[in-house]
């Protein structure tokens, strides 16, 4: 799972929407271990013949409180990671993961799934639109902050 999480960060860094720092992988590994210890599971892996193809990971409602104020819906989760290996993109793996995620979340009584996506990533916006997601807000930033003044 750490490899997939790092894959998202590395890919997003190509478009300027993530920054790789020396401690990034260590922090991601610790977060991954904590996520895998949660029961019931809130992360799902797609695989073929034992080979991992993709991952979807949401933060459970109690860990999604920081973003629940962005909507008036009831039980809310935050979709933290969605990643499919480059050779499998466009083959329906991501869509299958999201459909599975929605089915599980419906059964668990989740009302809303919120996520951030990399707008500069040419694959991200069309994918989430196809999955039925729509923007609620837009954020802007400048890097480095020193360039502001």
Language-model features and meaning:
Residues 10-31:
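Conserved GNAT-fold acetyl-CoA-binding loop/helix
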Residues 81-84, 90-107, 130:
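Conserved acetyl-CoA-binding loop-helix of GNAT-fold acetyltransferases
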Residues 114-124, 141-146:
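Conserved beta-strand-loop-alpha-helix junction that forms the acyl-donor binding cleft
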Residues 40-56:
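Conserved beta-hairpin
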Residues 95, 119-137:
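Conserved active-site alpha-helix within GNAT-family acetyltransferase domains
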Residues 30-44, 78:
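A short helix-loop-beta-strand connector motif used in the catalytic cores of GNAT acetyltransferases and
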Residues 59, 67-86, 141:
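Conserved acetyl-CoA binding element of GNAT-fold acetyltransferases
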Residues 105-117:
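Conserved GNAT acetyl-CoA-binding A-motif
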